[in-house]
Structures are given as structure tokens and as C-alpha cells.
Amino acid sequence: MIIAVYGKGGVGKSTTTSNLAVAIAKEGKRVLQIGCDPKSDSTFTIAGKMIPTVVEILDKFNYHYESIEPGDLIFTGYGGVDVVETGGPPAGSGCGGYVVGETVKLLEKMDVMARYDVILFDVLGDVVCGGFATPLQYADLACVVSSNDFDALFAANRICESVVEKNMSGYDVKMAGVIGNRCDQVDLLETFTRRIETPLMGVVPRKEEIRQSRVKGYTLFELEEMGEPVQDMTAEFRKMARYLLSKPDGVIPNAVGTREMFELFKGEDMPWKGSNGKTGASTPSAQ
């Protein structure tokens, strides 16, 4: 099973994907996580370090693909999860999405994809261009990570539009659901997922332990083993892992038009707004 994980930059995709990968591995599955971001830090908490990227390895071997072995690309981290980082071109040049496609071709040529029960793509994706949409062509399911705010949900909707587009182009990828991350509330998330007719898979709260795990290079499951109070969060990831391993049919999301996105949440209770809907304004009194 191949799963592509998308979401707005900075929303916590990599932290979410890494903990999900470990949760799936703890269910006895062989897991590969492929980081698809030029920052190359998707797998940092699993590997505990920044691993060499595909771009760096290709350069090392002077782009002689036939000289590269799986062990040059694939590293094993916490929980037995294998990891790959695509890397990307220097800032301001080239196409990061192209590198993602080339990485998949290289792994297929090495015949390593079939070794795994679950492959997770962690993909850069605020507004999905053709290159970074490439994992959707291979994926069985897509997940979108979003916080409970408009900008993150706007990006999530654009990703849903990409899933719709891929289905129209003949690819059989479905949405597994939306994952709420860094959430103190879920009102906007619930409104959005109802509108796009897609499950809200799980909700991870905003907790200092998550931020610390990212900085220190640990997954939440490692922190749990160290005695940190993160059981509620690891339980949520285990729940989502079991949901994905149940092989849900998934859905083609009922993506919202761009203009409708700006109207969708107007009915939400926003007490900081005046009665005429403008921030800080008050209803004029009758003279």
C-alpha cells in the first residue's frame, strides 16, 4: 500500500508522517518513508540525523544509476522504518518535483518497492504543482495534514483538487482522510471535512512535547519509551495506523471552488467580529 501525505508548509507533515510510519511499523509491517522536500528533513526524527539525499548520491556516482545500490539510498531508523530523502536542486534553480519522479524511477529500477507493506511519501505541497503531484500517480491513498485555520485548509482543498484531477486523468488514488495537527479546536476542520465529504482521520493536539521531539530528533514513540507523558498522542497515531491498515476504500473528495472556500466558514461563530461581520466594527445605533 502506498500513501501520499500532503499539507501546507509548516503544518507538521513530516512530524505526522514519521510518527505514522513508526505506528504502522509497530503493527508488524515493513515500512519505507520517502521524504519529498528539498529541505531533506522529513526523516530526521526517524533516522536521528540528516541522511544523504538521492541528489547527493547521484552526484557522488556521477549520475551512473547502474552503480548505485539500495544501501546507498535507503537507511534504517527507529522501529525498523526504512527512509529515503529525495533532496532537491539548489535554491532558485531546477525542479524539486522532477527529483521526486526520478527517485521513484530509481527505486523501481532497483526493484525495492515491492519489499514493503507500506510506503509513505511525505510531500511538499501548499499548492500542488505537477512535479510534486507525482506521488499521487503511484499512491493508493492520500492523506492531508491540516491545522484548524483557514490557510492550512485552503492548501488542503488545493490538494483535494489534485486528487480529483488525478482521478480524471485515469489514476486510482483516493483520499483516506484529513489529519488535524496542532489543534486546540476542530470547528473549522469539521466544517471543511463535512463539506468535502472526507473523513477526519484523527486529531493531534498542540503540545510542547511534539515540538521538542522534532527539535531533538525523536519520534513520539521514543519519547514514550523515555517516560515522557505522550501516551494520548501515540494512541492517536496507533488509531490512525490501524485505520490505514484496514485498507479503507477512500473517497474522491468533493473539493471546494476557490471562491467558495472564502465563503465556507462565514457561518462559523466568530465572537471577535461585530454583528456586521467586520473586525472591530459595531452596529450603528439608530438616530
UniProtKB/Swiss-Prot annotation:
Family: Belongs to the NifH/BchL/ChlL family.
Protein name from the UniProt record: Light-independent protochlorophyllide reductase iron-sulfur ATP-binding protein
Keyword Transport tagged: no
Xref: HAMAP family: ChlL_BchL (MF_00355)
Molecular function terms, GO-annotated: 4 iron, 4 sulfur cluster binding; ATP binding; metal ion binding; oxidoreductase activity, acting on iron-sulfur proteins as donors; oxidoreductase activity, acting on the CH-CH group of donors, iron-sulfur protein as acceptor
Cofactor mode of binding and number, as noted: Binds 1 [4Fe-4S] cluster per dimer.
Subunit (UniProt): Homodimer. Protochlorophyllide reductase is composed of three subunits; BchL, BchN and BchB.
Binding-site residues, [4Fe-4S] cluster: C95, C129
Species lineage: Bacteria, Bacillati, Bacillota, Clostridia, Eubacteriales
Catalytic activity, reaction form: chlorophyllide a + oxidized 2[4Fe-4S]-[ferredoxin] + 2 ADP + 2 phosphate = protochlorophyllide a + reduced 2[4Fe-4S]-[ferredoxin] + 2 ATP + 2 H2O
Superkingdom of this protein's organism: Bacteria
Sites where the protein binds Mg(2+): S14
Listed pathway(s): Porphyrin-containing compound metabolism; bacteriochlorophyll biosynthesis (light-independent)
BP-aspect Gene Ontology terms: light-independent bacteriochlorophyll biosynthetic process; photosynthesis, dark reaction
Pfam families noted in UniProt: Fer4_NifH (PF00142)
Residues that bind ATP: G10, V11, G12, K13, S14, T15, K39, N181, R182
Cofactors: [4Fe-4S] cluster
Gene3D superfamilies: P-loop containing nucleotide triphosphate hydrolases (3.40.50.300)
